[in-house]
Amino acid sequence: MQKRVVIAGGGTGGHLYPGIALAKALMRHDMDIKISFVGTQKGIEAKVLPREGFELKTILSAGLLGKKRLSRWMSWVKLPIGTAQSMCFLINKRPSLVVGLGGYASGPLVLSAWLLRIPILIHEQNSFPGLTNKWLGKIADKVAV
């Protein structure tokens, strides 16, 4: 039976490239694994992942903090939409693991995985975790630093 892993994160290369490295390492270790990514259309992942040969499902998501009032409000509106999109994607893919890399793109997917009781790994690349990984680390099964 083929294992399926969904990796979420992006927006910047700091979240995305460690995820690509993880995906390639998993594929080297286990040839019978299918890796998919979830991100946004506006993030770097929309350009990089197709070139790297990975499937990308785009969702609506945006950062929640550090914005002007209207932009912040729109970000909160996108959160339930992105979560619903993520839930549909996860129900369709039925992964054995969801990996959150941090950044606003990982929030809806990891929350959906938690609601669907899919195992969650948070992958933190920095010495100080970002806000998304701090929040999501509380519901994750494992946190890798």
Short names for language-model regions:
Residues 64-97, 115:
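An amphipathic, basic-hydrophobic alpha-helix
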Residues 2-9, 28-78:
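Conserved nucleotide-sugar phosphate-binding/catalytic loop shared by glycosyltransferases and other
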Residues 6, 36, 98-99, 121, ...:
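Structural detector of well-ordered beta-strand residues that form the stable sheet scaffold
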Residues 25-27, 92, 108-119, 138-139:
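Alpha-helix C-terminal capping segments
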Residues 33, 44, 55, 114-145:
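Active-site-proximal region of nucleotide-activated glycan assembly enzymes
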